[in-house]
Amino acid sequence: MYFPLHCHTHFSLLDGLSKPNQIAKRVKKLGLSGCAITDHGNISGSVSFVRAMNRHGLKPILGCELYICKQHASERKKENASLNHLVVLAKNLDGWKQLIKVTSESNKAEFFYRKPRLSLDQLSEFCDGNLIAFSGHLGSDLAEVVFGEKSKEAFSAKTYEEAESLVDPNWLKNTTELAQKYNSIFGEGNFFLEIQLIDQNISPSQTVVAKALRYISKKTGIPCVATPDAHYASRDDAEDQRVLLCANLETTIPSIKKKMANGESVPLETFFRSNSYHIPSPEEMLEIHTKEELENSIKIADMCEEYNILRQPILPPFPCEKGPEETLRQLCRDGWAQKIKDKIPKSKHNEYADRVKHELEVLQTAGLSSYFLIVRDIVNYVRDNGWLPGPGRGSAAGCLVSYLIGITSIDPIKYGLIFERFYNSGRNTSERVSMPDIDVDVPVSKRDEIIDYIKSKYGQEKVGQMITFQTMMGRGAIKDVLRAYGGISFDEMNLITKHIPDKAAIADELQEMFEETGESSVIRWALENNSEKLMDWCYIDEEGGVQGRLAKRFEQAIRLEGTKRAQSKHAAGVVISPQPLNEICPMILDTKTKQPVGGLEMQDMEDIGMIKFDILGIAMLDKIMGVENILEKGTVI
């Protein structure tokens, strides 16, 4: 047996293919005890990976394949642009915290250059014995040192003899010194020489490097470890991953094949030549690795403690003399006096009283008093500055407490709105309390100022925005697949995708599909419901199979739906934490604003205890304020 320690998910954007749950299913099928996640330059997939592994009773190990530059990362010279790879794993909870610090540091604006990066000396500041590292694949500096100045030539060598002839004369001295430097940085027993042989037939330099590292291991005592370089779960997924690579490289599979046939160099060529970047079976690994190298993978897994990064939501304290529970009750009493007592018929007072009593009992049992006080404070800041907040969006308008304390302006009883649609305590478990979701609509022009106020109140380092990912969905997935293979005109692509709806337009139908089958697909829904319009290209037969001229492409697009494609800053989400954000989650660089944002998605933020508040900039509120201003001035329109 062995333990896969080098695996990428679709959080390695347009490079890794598989979703965390697909990785977990593959590991379970192979009878392995767990798996490590080592995405390129980020740990954004860690929380969803832990959830997936937990569901399948498997051990998750959290790691990252870091980008290492040769000089200090603040240097942006040409000679410091090339990056080497280094894999690090968290041994324990302290190691996870160090991993957060490392990835946050590499994402600082002064260090980020095309990729998040650090020099080895910068990285060493975070190595306190709680991180395990191994040298990396052919993209590592150790592999580079084996060949010296001829490394690029060696990595494209076609035969073992050619690659071996390009080994640097001083390889032994230079490689030994570098390996010992790594060993010193990470601490005795925490550094391993990584042996990858998955593509030795296609990439003979891989075999040369493995031979060199095995020799260094005997010379220094630094152990070797066998790893895959998994970019997808199963061998059958290779063709799907190539679609991602084509989107990344802005090319097509026919173009790549033509260049390879002509002997031209192609970026990421081995991915197009090989189907071996999957999670191998133990039998596959035993064919190419020594027993000791496989046993060391299990040894490393055993060195990594089991720890839990998931936790209950932690609300930041809201300053109030009488405590949040009594303060919220008093605000409800004040709201009653202003909005109910003399404005609602007495015959209905009991209905209102029963409703507010029930809501307070539910909300305060769940420990949510501070949440409502924080939201109210934000809304009050908007009003106190003479700006216009929204009256209440979505299910939050069904909460009488929100109306009484001034978060919303809508009486839920008057309009027959249901509290349980806003907050259902039945979703709470002993492990987790469900958080409410109140969207605060604010003028677009004032949103940044409002966020600055929140930062000033709770602490600059405790407030931040978060990342969101764009995924391949429906139309986009079809277009990515068709572009990758070529042969379809732009006009025909648009004609096809015209009959595939947006995900949001069929959200309820997709939910029903998921409840019935465990999966949901916009494309599949379109084939089942717009069959006549798509018949020229693809259709579903009586047995549920996909048929037609473009059946294979549609099937591929269905498989790719939901795959991460790009990242950006979330349009509305703001998190407020009782402790500095960079102690709880990785901070990544928003390349547009050059500002750090939380490097986890909304659901993942909540799963590690962060509280998310939606502050939505609404342009219509700016326009209404503009009209009010004109009317106040008495300007003739």
Give the label of every model feature segment.
Residues 1-637:
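Alpha-helical scaffold/interaction cores of sigma-54-like transcription cofactors
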